[in-house]
Every structure is written in C-alpha cells, then in structure tokens.
Swiss-Prot record:
Ca(2+) binds at residues 120, 166, 175, 209. It catalyses: Endohydrolysis of (1->4)-alpha-D-glucosidic linkages in polysaccharides containing three or more (1->4)-alpha-linked D-glucose units. The lineage of its organism: Bacteria, Bacillati, Actinomycetota, Actinomycetes, Kitasatosporales. It comes from Streptomyces limosus. This is Alpha-amylase. One of its GO terms (molecular function) is starch binding.
Length: 566
C-alpha cells in the first residue's frame, strides 16, 4: 500500500477505460514452483522489459511486479503513482504501448507480470493528470461522480471500527463505494483491460479498506480463473479488520513476517527461526505473500531495508531459502527524503547507478532464486544452530544453506541431505565437495552465507552457478583494527558492490592482521577497488590514496597482497 503518512496507506483505485466482458469467476492462482516475484518499484516499463531479459528470466524469477500503470496526479513524489485520476495507462512509467511491449518482452523471457492495482480510492485535490485528464475530488469525468463514493467524507480515524476503516477516506482520498454494482463493474473493467494486455496477476493495494465480500464480487468479474491475486492487508493487533478475512479471494501479504525478521536479525538470535512461519501464528503458507521490505516499510522503519547492510542481505537469503509463503524481492532506489520519487523519472540506465539499488540482481539474492526453484516442495531438514546467530538447514535432498550473522567465521562440518559429489556454493562461487553421507566441511565468513543445490553442481557453467570463464580475486590486506572494527572491500564491479559502502564485502579476520576474502569474477576482468573499515555502529572510513587496480587472469585465481593505507 502506498502511504503518504506513516500510519495510513495511499491506495489509488480503479475503474476501467475499456469495459471488457469477464467470463467465469476467477479463483486465486498461486504462482507455482517459480514463486519469487521481483518488485521493480517505480521502474519505467521499458526498464522493466530490459530487466526481464537481462536478469529476471535468467535468474529464474517467476514474476515481476510493476508499479501502478494508470494515469495519476502530477508530481515527482513516488506516492503520486498511488493517486489515480483515470484508468488510462498514461502514468509516469509509460504509456499503453510501452506497457504492452514490456509485458510481451517479459513473457518472452519466461517472466509473468503482476500489476500493482489501486482500486480503493481516487485522487484528492484537483488539476490535470499525467495523461491530460481533468479532475477534482469526487468528480472524475467519464468515470466517477460523487454518487459513486462512500457517504463518509472524513478521514479514517478509528482502526477499531470496521465501518470507519472501510467506508471513510484513507488520508483524505476519495473512497469508492465498492458495494455498488456499477463501481464493481468499472473496477473489473479496468482489471480486465490490463488482462487484455497480457497481465498475469494483480497486487490489490489497500485491500483492508474494502470489505472482503466486495473484493470477492469484483474478482468474480475478472479473468478466467487463472489470474493471481495478492492483497495488501496490514495486520494490526486488536483491529476490527484482519488480513485473514481476505484469504478466500487470493493470497494475502503477511506483514508480521517482515517485522519479525527485523526483530530477530537486529535484537534476537537466528536460532529462533527454526519454526518460522505458521507456528508463529502467521496465515497459511500457501496463501501468504512475504517480503523483507516493501516501498512503504523501508521508509517507515518497521522492517529492515538496504541501509542495514549484511543483516538485510542475509534476511533476503533466509527468505528465499525458507519454505514459507511466496517471496517478493523489493528492488528500489536510495532515498533520504521519504517522499522522493524515482531517479531519472523511473528510467534505469544501469543497475547501481543514479541511486538504483537493484536488489533483485544482487548476486547474494539472485543466486537464491534458482535454489528456491530447485527445492520447491522440499521440507526443512538437518537444522543446526549454535544457539546464536549461526544457522544451517537443508531442503530435503535438493539444497542446503548456512547463514552466519555473527562477527567471526563459521567453520564446521555440516550434515546435509544432498547426494555426494561436487557443488557450487552459489553465494561465493567456490566449489564444495559433499561426501556420500551428505557431510561437507566449509568456512562461512562473518556476515555471509553458503548455499548449495542440485541445480548448481559446478561453478564453471551449468546449473545456476557462475558461468563459463568464472574465476576469482583473492583479497589479502594487512590491517590492524580496534575492537569492533572490521575491514571491507568494494569496487567498480557488481560482485564488489559497485562502490556502495552498504554493499561492501567483509573480509575474514581468521589470519589477523591479514584479512582475506575470495570474490568470484569473470576471467580477464579489469577492475578498481579500495578497502574501508567500519566500526560497530557501521560508520565507514575509507583507506587513503587512489583507487587500486587489478585484472583477473584468464586461468586461476588472482591473489592480491595489500597493506592498508592509513
């Protein structure tokens, strides 16, 4: 849900410009084995299309979710996309032709498309929308008039009162009366128009602010039974409207999952995650959509976000490895102003440039999509933890994952259910040999993970591991540190974090004062890099001097023996 204020969601709604006839009532259709969605928040449709071809399809993502496509109020802020004024596809992110081209391109790459859909309300204020449509609150020519709005014309102010939550105005936005047949038909017409362009599913923004029966009636007019629905219904203890009410219509986003991941990764022990999911009181796994963060929560602070470094990355690794719910991988942009809209108006010229974070393409996360697909349907097996922040577990005989959220390396012999043989650790790009009894010995550096699966048996082509010509750079730097400090490396390659201190790679201090780390890089790659140190609070200090330079050899690993420059 798009929230202009921290406590409320901005949902922008919906009737359709083109009235299409809907066939049979639609049933919720879960994504299936490829159940990971990349949420490309505020990406232009042309940029989404390139991502489907270049990264999402090859990584094995099942879906891409795009931001609301309909015409909306003008303004640079991100939340303008969630204040619609019509149902023309004429927003900041592209027109109808660009949208259709994106859908076709993503389908060709094997990626289905989910459209974020705002059908609870319309924009407040007055003016001209991004597609040229004039509007004022309660009057949207050719679509809605005041008679189509709920009678309550004041803002929601009591979440303990069902009528207040579902009939009054979310942050002052014009609330549609979804109990009326005409309103339901117009909303369904908009969604059917998107289906006619090839859309495969919808995220229903602010579902909580519409009665579940109204959404059921609307969905019965949409599609042919194969449409995927994912509904935003934020859990609030003691509130009158609960997310579970919407399970009959489709999947529901389980916000408690993300909040609890933040608490565990920041204040508790990962060992507590052994029974994470339904045993924690969550909704049924098969009907839940989960995430580490989304566009609202990363700004509101109730979940982890990209500013939390390795905790954020490892939480994503865990989510993709753990068999609960259907995961969303949020992929947005850097911000200091919580209202700031997308860089370049949504055009992504390149990942990791202009502030685009591209979490969907981070090697630590994209490599886990293939693991999740391989392990689909497999139970958790061979759980191990140290009572603290080091855990490991298998997914039947298909996969095994270890996560080290502590400040020192984890070195042990792990018991997996994997068949014996060679595997690629898709987190590091290093080969791991599993014995005939399923055991293997490995070191997992602090703040990193290890991930093996039967779809990635070698690191030099095949499976989902690094491709042919992959070798590595072995960083060794002599650096003395104070208590609580650690040494990191970053550089001009995606595998090195693209000069982003938040994504810099932590070196292993096992041979202190020499810190070491092997990083997979393509053979023959020239690159620049530099070391930095971070204190316990995460404050970074760069070493002095110019950027260091090196080139990976065509065969074998490149070893760099450096000394910290004070």
């Amino acid at each position: 849900m798009a929230r202009r204020l921290a406590t409320a969601s901005l949902a922008v709604l919906a009737a359709a410009a083109t009235a299409l006839t809907a066939p049979t009532p639609a049933a919720a259709a879960p994504p299936g084995a490829k159940d990971v969605t990349a949420v490309l928040f505020e990406w232009k449709f042309a940029s989404v299309a390139r991502a489907c071809t270049d990264s999402l399809g090859p990584a094995g993502y099942g879906y891409v979710q795009v931001s609301p496509p309909q015409e909306h109020i003008q303004g640079s802020q991100w939340w303008t996309s969630y204040q619609p004024v019509s149902y023309k596809i004429a927003g900041r992110l592209g027109d109808r032709a660009a949208f259709k081209s994106m859908v076709d391109t993503c389908h060709a790459a094997g990626v289905k498309v989910v459209a974020d859909s705002v059908i609870n309300h319309m924009a407040a204020g007055s003016g001209t929308g991004t597609g040229g449509s004039a509007y004022q609150k309660y009057d949207y020519p050719g679509i809605w008039s005041g008679a189509d709005m709920d009678d309550c014309r004041s803002e929601i102010n009591d979440y303990g009162n069902r009528a207040n939550v579902q009939n009054c105005e979310l942050v002052g936005l014009a609330d549609l009366d979804t109990g009326e047949s005409y309103v339901r038909d117009r909303i369904a017409a908009y969604l059917n128009d998107l289906l006619s362009l090839g859309v495969d599913g919808f995220r229903i923004d602010a579902a909580k602010h519409m009665p579940a029966a109204d959404l059921t009636a609307i969905k019965a007019k949409v599609g042919n039974g194969s449409t995927y629905w994912k509904q935003e219904a934020i859990h609030g203890a003691g509130e009158a409207v609960q997310p579970s009410e919407y399970l009959g219509t489709g999947d529901v986003q389980e916000f408690r999952y993300a909040r609890d991941l933040k608490r565990v990764f920041q204040n508790e022990n990962l060992a507590h995650l052994k029974n994470f999911g339904e045993d924690w009181g969550y909704m049924a796994s098969g009907k839940s959509a989960v995430f580490v963060d989304n566009h609202d929560t990363e700004r509101g602070g109730d979940t982890l976000n990209y500013k939390n470094g390795s905790a954020y990355t490892l939480a994503g690794v865990f989510m993709l490895a753990w068999p609960y719910g259907s995961p969303d991988v949020h992929s947005g942009y850097e911000f200091t102003d919580h209202d700031a809209g997308p860089p370049n108006g949504g055009t992504v010229n390149a990942c990791y440039s202009d502030g685009w974070k591209c979490q969907h393409a981070w090697p630590e996360l994209s490599s886990m999509v293939g693991l999740r697909n391989t392990a689909s349907g497999q139970p958790v097996t061979n759980w191990w933890d140290n009572g603290g922040d080091q855990i490991a577990f298998g997914r039947g005989d298909k996969a095994y994952v270890a996560i080290n959220h502590e400040g020192s390396a984890l070195n042990r012999t792990f018991q997996s259910g994997l068949p014996g043989g060679a595997y690629c650790d898709v987190q590091s790009g290093r080969s791991v040999t599993v014995g005939s009894d399923g055991t293997f010995t490995a070191t997992v550096a602090a703040g990193t993970a290890l991930a093996l699966h039967t779809g990635a048996r070698t690191c030099s082509g095949g499976g989902t591991g690094p491709g042919t010509g992959q070798t590595s750079a072995s960083f060794h730097v002599n650096a003395t540190t104070a208590w609580g400090e650690n040494i990191y490396v970053t550089g001009d390659q995606a595998a090195l974090g693209n000069w982003d201190p938040a994504r810099a790679l932590k070196l292993d201090p096992a041979a202190y004062p020499v810190w070491k780390l092997d990083v997979p890089l393509a053979a023959g790659t020239p690159f620049q890099y530099k070391y930095l140190r971070k204190d316990a609070a995460g404050k970074a200090v760069w070493e002095s001097g110019a950027n260091r330079t090196a080139t990976v050899g065509t065969t074998g690993a490149l070893t760099l023996n450096d000394t910290w420059r004070g």
